[in-house]
């Protein structure tokens, strides 16, 4: 029997791009999407430096074990907050990492003046959908459309 004990140390906003962050996205993004490559160092730098995005990372036993991107932007009807690209390393799943990332994002959106936080999640991501519902997210009666360029 293998016992995995994890200690979530903290969730933080990435302030700079270093080898650790680049390497973390190199192993995390393939666990989220097989159709999109991990962001390059330059793309990560653009994300971290953008006033419209917060790159959150969760550390477990000192190692980056999860990430979430919080996109915030103002439109005529108010400040919008969107949670995007939530990914937790397979070895750390089921230990509260995703919950910690989402709670941090919700609180940060609230602190910055948003009144709602939106996200999308594929139906096949059953564990993630249960987490979102447990945290208080509710399905909206809306359609999501995509135009591919």
Language-model features: locations:
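Conserved active-site alpha-helix within GNAT-family acetyltransferase domains
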Residues: 99, 103, 111, 123-141, ...
């Amino acid at each position: 029997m293998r016992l995995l004990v994890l200690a979530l140390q903290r969730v933080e906003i990435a302030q700079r791009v270093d080898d650790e962050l680049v390497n973390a996205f190199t192993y995390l993004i393939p666990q989220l999407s097989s159709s999109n490559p991990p962001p390059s160092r330059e793309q990560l730098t653009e994300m971290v430096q953008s006033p419209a995005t917060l790159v959150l990372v969760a550390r477990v036993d000192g190692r980056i074990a999860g990430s979430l991107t919080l996109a915030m932007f103002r439109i005529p009807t108010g400040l919008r907050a969107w949670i995007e690209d939530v990914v937790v390393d397979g070895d750390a799943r089921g230990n509260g990492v995703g919950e910690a990332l989402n709670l941090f994002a919700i609180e940060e959106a609230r602190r910055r003046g948003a009144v709602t936080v939106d996200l999308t999640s594929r139906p096949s991501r059953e564990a993630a959908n249960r987490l979102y519902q447990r945290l208080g997210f509710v399905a909206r009666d809306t359609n999501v459309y995509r135009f591919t360029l």
